[in-house]
């Protein structure tokens, strides 16, 4: 029998028989590990412990102590949900039920569910878990599998697509339930300590709006009930912080039906925040030596064919015909920047050339995937591109790392860093990939950055450094990125004249400090719970006259505060009501002015933490405001 070589996480290797399973490898390593095996990772892909190994690979054993265990548990929980739904609605047609970052879902056809249904499904699922049913993998002949799903066109389509082939197909069973599935799963339903059905939504089969409409049932699961309750508490807090809710309450943005899906309108308050965000990175770009450029929203599709986007992204592009010529709204800014570079004549002494643009782009996401500002059709990227010599990459990346770290620290966002390396399908020589990955590693190591390596997760055109950050609720988001690109310079024939007077191709560096403004704005709304730092707040100071007799002085105080965003509360309300309203509006500072303050040419300062300081000299407050805003401090601190 032939053998294969498996490489373990520590770099050691084992020779095992071809066809041996992940579990067999675990037993080969040690009997204890074999008993504890839940699943495995083959070449970084999560697989069932029963998965056979037919070729040389890297392998990692997953136990209940592994980070991936939660994914496996939730995959089984999705089957528990499907089993409960089928018991409650025997006519329901099951489609797919994957695990997700926060739980799982199952898409079903031929049924609609209301709140009472969800309660009954929750109770049924609890019974299935209490029964501690064994979860077992079985294999069916392909013809038998098709016969099994004679009345389920969705499962038959999966058999003909993802599960296509000549061999048997795997199912997982638990009690009276079985489902077409490649795994992995835990050993029994009783391993699920906490289970909750969350909500439903509409979905489309295959994410295609032209296909069947389905009901998507969301749930989550954890090893313990206490883990579940902690999650549910965070989820309730997240609902209170939901940027869509706060966006309405604070008059930041709207997405009305009349404008179309995924096309946000920014109201004056929201635009104020976005303008401050833009001015901040504009200053950083200037310090780093970037020149601001601007490209149109619309290009001939010839540009997108040259860049490769037409081949890879045409289904996500908005296309239109103009005088029998095809144009496309830009899904990315980089081809425009490459074209600008190509319009010049460059020497090696001119490099690096750095461009940046707050560029609006358009991507046609499926309507069912659109959500507030997190997934939209039209969004703006703080896009930057560097055209550099290979020997300049390290210095450029180091400076970008410093700047990105400064940005995330400014907003008090915790972050993680990952180095994504060469994927199987890539462009560029081995030498330039090795050099580029080495340079990125050296930058990360020299700066003492704690980072993970994500093998094969780089873009096809070059390796990248990804920043993922966490908000105040501990949720993870994709953040800034630094990517090296060998593909676009080649496609656009970019060149510069080297010291040898020959033509050379520059390396292109893509970078974004925020990513999408929309996504970053959404994160900040929820991260701060609408309580923006003073420098970002749409209204920084509200002046509260005690009576109408103090209105004149209130306006004089406003004038003294110059260009700050200051409003005078002139409604005929009590001071208490004015203070409460300012708190509700998340205004950082309130200045109460009555006869005593007017006589002393002073103000009484209150902040949104409900602290108060009486008889404050206005010049003193103004000087502190200057310092707080210039320093971009995260909380009002005059009264500290």
Curated annotation (Swiss-Prot):
Q: Cellular component terms, GO, for this chain's entry? A: cytoplasm
Q: One GO molecular function term?
A: threonine-tRNA ligase activity
- Entry EC no(s): 6.1.1.3
Q: List the disulfide bonds.
A: none
- Which UniProt keyword terms apply here? Aminoacyl-tRNA synthetase, ATP-binding, Cytoplasm, Ligase, Metal-binding, Nucleotide-binding, Protein biosynthesis, RNA-binding, tRNA-binding, Zinc
- Which CDD domains does the record cross-reference, listed alphabetically? TGS_ThrRS, ThrRS_anticodon, ThrRS_core
**Residues covered by region (Catalytic):** 242-533
Q: By what means is the activity of this protein regulated?
A: Inhibited by 1 uM borrelidin (BN).
User: What cofactor does this protein call for?
Assistant: Zn(2+)
- Keyword Cytoplasm assigned: yes
Cellular compartment(s): Cytoplasm
Q: Which InterPro entries match?
A: aa-tRNA-synt_IIb (IPR002314), aa-tRNA-synth_II (IPR006195), aa-tRNA-synth_II/BPL/LPL (IPR045864), Anticodon-bd (IPR004154), Anticodon-bd_dom_sf (IPR036621), Beta-grasp_dom_sf (IPR012675), TGS (IPR004095), TGS-like (IPR012676)
- Mind telling me which SMART domains this protein's record contains? tRNA_SAD (SM00863)
GO annotation terms (biological process): threonyl-tRNA aminoacylation
**What range(s) does the TGS domain occupy?**
1-63
Q: Which residues does the annotation say bind Zn(2+)?
A: 334, 385, 510
The record's remark on the cofactor is: Binds 1 zinc ion per subunit.
Pfam families attached to this UniProt entry: HGTP_anticodon, TGS, tRNA-synt_2b, tRNA_SAD
Give yes or no: UniProt keyword Cell inner membrane: no
What's its catalytic activity? tRNA(Thr) + L-threonine + ATP = L-threonyl-tRNA(Thr) + AMP + diphosphate + H(+)
What does the annotation say about its assembly with partners? Homodimer.
What is the recorded function of this protein according to its Swiss-Prot or TrEMBL entry?
Catalyzes the attachment of threonine to tRNA(Thr) in a two-step reaction: L-threonine is first activated by ATP to form Thr-AMP and then transferred to the acceptor end of tRNA(Thr).
Recorded hits in PANTHER family, A to Z, give: THREONINE--TRNA LIGASE, CHLOROPLASTIC_MITOCHONDRIAL 2 (PTHR11451:SF44), THREONINE-TRNA LIGASE (PTHR11451)
Family recorded in the similarity comment: Belongs to the class-II aminoacyl-tRNA synthetase family.
Q: What is this protein called?
A: Threonine--tRNA ligase
């Amino acid at each position: 029998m032939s053998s294969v070589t498996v490489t373990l996480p520590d770099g050691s290797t084992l020779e095992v028989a071809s066809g041996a399973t992940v579990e067999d490898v675990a037993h080969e390593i040690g009997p204890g590990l074999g008993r504890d095996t839940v699943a495995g990772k083959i070449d970084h892909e999560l697989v069932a412990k029963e998965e056979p190994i037919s070729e040389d690979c890297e392998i990692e054993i997953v136990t209940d102590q592994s980070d991936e265990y939660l994914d496996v548990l939730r995959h089984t929980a999705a089957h528990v949900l499907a089993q409960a739904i089928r018991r409650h609605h025997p006519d329901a047609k099951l489609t797919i039920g994957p695990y997700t970052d926060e739980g799982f879902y199952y898409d079903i056809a031929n049924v609609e569910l209301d709140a009472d249904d969800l309660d009954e499904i929750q109770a049924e699922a609890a019974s299935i878990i209490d029964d501690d049913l064994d979860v077992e993998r079985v294999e069916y002949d392909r013809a038998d599998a098709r016969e099994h799903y004679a009345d389920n066109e969705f499962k038959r389509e999966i058999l003909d697509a993802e599960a296509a082939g000549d061999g048997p197909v795997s199912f997982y069973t638990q009690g009276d339930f079985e489902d077409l599935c490649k795994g992995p799963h835990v050993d029994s339903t009783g391993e699920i300590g906490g289970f909750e059905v969350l909500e439903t939504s509409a979905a489309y089969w295959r994410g295609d709006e032209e296909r069947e409409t389905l009901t998507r049932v969301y749930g989550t699961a954890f090893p313990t009930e206490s883990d579940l309750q902690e999650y549910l508490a965070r989820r309730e807090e997240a609902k209170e912080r939901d940027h869509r809710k706060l966006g309405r309450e604070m008059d930041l943005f709207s997405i009305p039906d009349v404008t179309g899906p995924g096309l946000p309108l920014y109201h004056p308050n929201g635009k104020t925040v976005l303008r401050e965000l833009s001015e901040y990175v504009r200053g950083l770009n200037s310090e780093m030596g970037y020149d601001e450029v601007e490209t149109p929203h619309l290009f001939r599709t010839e540009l997108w064919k040259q860049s490769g986007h037409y081949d890879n992204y045409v289904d996500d592009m908005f296309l239109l015909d103009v005088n029998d010529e095809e144009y496309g709204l830009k899904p990315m800014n980089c081809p425009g920047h490459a074209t600008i570079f190509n319009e010049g004549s460059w020497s090696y002494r001119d490099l690096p050339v750095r461009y940046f643009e707050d560029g609006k782009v358009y991507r046609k996401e499926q309507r069912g995937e659109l959500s507030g500002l997190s997934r939209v059709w039209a969004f703006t990227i703080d896009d930057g591109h560097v055209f550099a010599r290979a020997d300049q990459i390290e210095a450029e990346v180091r400076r970008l790392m410093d700047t990105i770290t400064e940005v995330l620290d400014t907003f008090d966002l915790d972050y993680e860093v990952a180095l994504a390396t060469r994927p199987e399908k890539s462009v560029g020589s081995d030498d330039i990939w090795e050099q580029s990955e080495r340079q990125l590693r050296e930058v990360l190591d020299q700066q003492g950055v704690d980072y993970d390596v994500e093998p094969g997760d780089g873009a096809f055109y070059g390796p990248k450094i990804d920043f993922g950050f966490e908000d105040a609720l501990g949720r993870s988001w994709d953040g800034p990125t630094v990517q090296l690109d060998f593909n676009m310079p080649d496609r656009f024939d970019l060149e510069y004249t080297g010291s040898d007077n020959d033509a050379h191709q520059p390396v292109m560096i893509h970078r974004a400090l925020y990513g999408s403004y929309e996504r970053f704005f959404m994160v900040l709304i929820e991260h701060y719970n609408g309580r923006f730092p003073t420098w970002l707040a749409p209204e920084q100071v509200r002046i509260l006259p005690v009576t109408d007799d103090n209105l004149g002085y209130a306006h004089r105080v406003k004038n003294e505060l110059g260009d700050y965003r200051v409003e005078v509360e002139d409604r005929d309300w009590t001071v208490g009501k004015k203070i409460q309203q300012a708190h509700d509006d998340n205004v950082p500072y309130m200045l109460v002015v009555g006869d005593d303050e007017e006589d002393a040419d002073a103000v009484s300062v209150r902040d949104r933490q409900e602290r108060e300081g009486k008889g404050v000299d206005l010049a003193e407050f103004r000087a502190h405001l200057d310092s707080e805003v210039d320093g971009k401090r995260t909380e009002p601190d005059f009264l500290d």
